[in-house]
From Swiss-Prot:
Keyword entries, A-Z: ATP-binding, Cytoplasm, Kinase, Metal-binding, Nucleotide-binding, Transferase
GO terms, molecular function: ATP binding; metal ion binding; pyridoxal kinase activity
Lineage: Eukaryota, Amoebozoa, Evosea, Eumycetozoa, Dictyostelia
GO BP: any one term: aggregation involved in sorocarp development
Listed EC numbers: 2.7.1.35
Protein name per UniProt: Pyridoxal kinase
Catalysed transformations (reactions): pyridoxal + ATP = pyridoxal 5'-phosphate + ADP + H(+)
Broadest EC class assigned to this enzyme: transferase
Pfam families named among the record's database cross-references: Phos_pyr_kin (PF08543)
Residues noted as binding substrate in the record, renumbered to the chain: S10, T45, Y122, D228
Similarity-based family: Belongs to the pyridoxine kinase family.
C-alpha cells in the first residue's frame, strides 16, 4: 500500500508550525498527506497578537465523518498528531486513531505529545493525564521533548540514565519507538542531545536498541515550529527506513539542523528592530536539504 498520512495538528496563515510544516516536509519526501487543522491562526502565538479559532470536537468529528462517508479513510497508512488544546478535542483525535486502526490493523500512529517547552506547559494541565493514560498507550512512535517527558513520567532528566529510565516507562505503556527530541545537560552545554529507543523484535539478549545523537553547536535563537518539523521528518524517514530508528533520526535531525542554519544565516537581512518572534523557518528556501539529505550527525549506541 502506498504511504498516506492523516495529520491532525495546528495551522497558521503566516509562518511554519504544525501542519504548515508537516505537509511541506512530507510532500517533499514524496509522501501523500491529508491535513486536519485542529487550530487555524493568523500566525504563531509568539507574535504580539494573533487571530483565529480552534476546531471544536464536533467539527473535527464532522470533518473525519466526511472522509468516511466518501470512503477515503481506508487508504491511510499513518496518523500524525501534534498540537491540541483541549481534553475534548484530544479525545476526539483518539477516537479517530482507534477507528482507523480498526479499519487497518497495520496503521502506524505517530504522536507528538505537544504539552510545553522550557520547563513550562502551554496547554491545560489536564491534557498531561490524557496523554499519559489514554493517548500514548495507542501510539507506535512518540517524539516528546525534555519538558514533555518530565511532565509525562515525573522523572527529572539530568543525564543519559535518567532519560533511559523515562523511556522505559514509555515502553511499558506500550510504545515501541521513543525519541526524546531535545535534551539539555550541564555536561554538554554546547550541544543538544537526542536519545532514541526501539523495542527489539529479534530473539536475542538485547531488549532495546538504544542510541544517542549529539547535535551542535546549538543555536542561541529560538524558532517556532522546529519540533513540529522534526516530527514530520522523523515520520517521513520512518516510512523509508521502518526498521532503523537510529538512521531515521540521523537523517531527520541533519535536515532540521541545516534548515535552522539556513534560517539563522538569513537573519542579517532582517531589520535590527525586529524581535526574534518574527524569525520564521525558511522552509521554501531550504527545500534542497529535505530532498537531498546528507547525514551530518551520527548516532552512538547506548
Amino acid at each position: 500500500m502506498e504511504p498516506k498520512v492523516l495529520s491532525i495538528q495546528s495551522w497558521v496563515c503566516h509562518g511554519y508550525v504544525g501542519n504548515k510544516c508537516a505537509v511541506f516536509a512530507l510532500q517533499h519526501l514524496g509522501i501523500e498527506v491529508d491535513p486536519i487543522n485542529s487550530v487555524h491562526l493568523s500566525n504563531n502565538t509568539a507574535y504580539p497578537t494573533w487571530k483565529g479559532e480552534s476546531l471544536t470536537p464536533n467539527k473535527l468529528g464532522d470533518l473525519f465523518q466526511g472522509l468516511e462517508d466518501n470512503h477515503l479513510t481506508s487508504n491511510y497508512t499513518h496518523v500524525l498528531t501534534g498540537y491540541n488544546n483541549s481534553v475534548q478535542t484530544l479525545h476526539t483525535v483518539l477516537k479517530i486513531v482507534k477507528k482507523l486502526k480498526s479499519e487497518n490493523p497495520n496503521l502506524i500512529y505517530v504522536c507528538d505529545p505537544v504539552l510545553g517547552d522550557n520547563n513550562e506547559l502551554y496547554v491545560p494541565e489536564d491534557l498531561v493525564e490524557v496523554y499519559k493514560n489514554e493517548v500514548i498507550p495507542n501510539a507506535d512512535y512518540i517524539f516528546p521533548n525534555q519538558t514533555e517527558v518530565e511532565f509525562l513520567t515525573g522523572i527529572k532528566i539530568k543525564n543519559d540514565q535518567d532519560a533511559l529510565k523515562a523511556i522505559d516507562q514509555f515502553h511499558k505503556m506500550g510504545v515501541k519507538n521513543v525519541v526524546i527530541t531535545s535534551l539539555f545537560f550541564d555536561t554538554n552545554p554546547n550541544d543538544i542531545i537526542v536519545i532514541g529507543s526501539t523495542i527489539n523484535d529479534d530473539d536475542n539478549n538485547n531488549k532495546y536498541n538504544q542510541f544517542k545523537i549529539k547535535v551542535g553547536p546549538k543555536f542561541n535563537d529560538y524558532y517556532t515550529g522546529t519540533g513540529d518539523l522534526l516530527s514530520s521528518l522523523l515520520l517521513g524517514w520512518s516510512i523509508r527506513e521502518p526498521t532503523d530508528l537510529s538512521l531515521v533520526c540521523e537523517k531527520a535531525i541533519s535536515i532540521l539542523y541545516n534548515i535552522i542554519n539556513e534560517t539563522h544565516n538569513s537573519k542579517k537581512s532582517i531589520p535590527s528592530n525586529k524581535e526574534k518572534q518574527y524569525y520564521e523557518l525558511r522552509l521554501v528556501q531550504s527545500r534542497k536539504f529535505i530532498e537531498n539529505s546528507e547525514i551530518r550527525f551520527k548516532s552512538e549506541k547506548l
